[in-house]
Amino acid sequence: MGPGIQPTSARPCSRTKHSRFALLAAALTARRVKQFTKQFRSRRMAEDILKLWQRQYHLPREDSDKRTLRERVHLYRPPRSDLGGIAVAVTVIALWATLFVYGLWFVKLPWALKVGETATSWATIAAVFFSLEFLYTGLFITTHDAMHGTIALRNRRLNDFLGQLAISLYAWFDYSVLHRKHWEHHNHTGEPRVDPDFHRGNPNLAVWFAQFMVSYMTLSQFLKIAVWSNLLLLAGAPLANQLLFMTAAPILSAFRLFYYGTYVPHHPEKGHTGAMPWQVSRTSSASRLQSFLTCYHFDLHWEHHRWPYAPWWELPKCRQIARGAALAPGPLPVPAAAAATAATAAAAAAATGSPAPASRAGSASSASAAASGFGSGHSGSVAAQPLSSLPLLSEGVKGLVEGAMELVAGGSSSGGGGEGGKPGAGEHGLLQRQRQLAPVGVMA
């Protein structure tokens, strides 16, 4: 064989080369088709989940007709399975039960020792108390998620059972009462005398907190607590331990929930007496860990109102989505008097050629834009009002003490204030479908 001639088996075969390219192209095409199919199924499944949610619950009034279902799903996709919600709820309840038993029967308080007993160290007592208080908060958050159907959306009875169980262990609240009032809060957020969680004309911390707590208490709740306490006494749980771990801890937890979940996000600015819809509620920019330790991400309150079908552990994800979509809380609307004053000042400034002073009235147009442009996806121009860092709890305690002094002095009257609407005015969804929305399968 001559020096420039290759054997037949060593010559490149154009047919083989083309077949390899064809196989590679087919593999890439199949992969793309598989990815597209997976994405389509995922989106379709998310749409089905949201449709199921909407048949049982209600989207916020401002969001009902502004976006299509596909657009809402594109922003946030609910969990595909109930397993995550059930696992989180059961874990919180189990951790609380373990620490509750330890605190009631194994912690020896120095002021309630029996003969021959050794007191538990103060460090251990403090660790148990604050850990249990945090888990009490988790119990309420679990109930809150149950009221939104985010524990077990596909099994309403199990969902409501876990919510009822958690709130019974918390403080024997009536789950059906909480369920009804919480959805009134979502459907009438910030409407004076209509929103059960909004202040009654006096936004003082102590006054608001007292009214908030009293509105959810019932006589049957106290009867259940009395029976439960006596059963624990018969089981050997000292009364002193009950007062510390079963009374003080949930009260502190209730204040934490109110402060970060109601007072901070829905507190009106000074001089504002009208409605405060959820679009202008404040939210937190704290880190994921800080937000969790604060109140199980309850400080991400704007995101919760925007996507009420998102479980608490996915609220940080909702915040990322909101930032990516240029969605943000809007500014409060300006009272008419303040707007007129600002307009006069602006006119005077224009006449003299001097720059107008900075004023909240300058954001009045953006406030109306927030109401009109939010649903249509143009809220990126709305000035955001996130909290760079939530106020310290000590500030809240200080305000609570000041408010208590005001109550003692007779300053708790909240006669006027606020533009009260008629109860039921602007009713939407929930109150018209009470039978469909009422919790089912709950404990008696």
UniProtKB/Swiss-Prot annotation:
Residues 412-427 have a biased composition (Gly residues). GO terms for biological process: carotenoid biosynthetic process. Its EC number is 1.14.99.64, 1.14.99.63. It comes from the Eukaryota. Pathway: Carotenoid biosynthesis; astaxanthin biosynthesis. One of its GO terms (molecular function) is oxidoreductase activity, acting on paired donors, with incorporation or reduction of molecular oxygen. This is Zeaxanthin 4-ketolase. It comes from Chlamydomonas reinhardtii (Chlamydomonas smithii). The lineage of its organism: Eukaryota, Viridiplantae, Chlorophyta, core chlorophytes, Chlorophyceae. The gene is BKT.
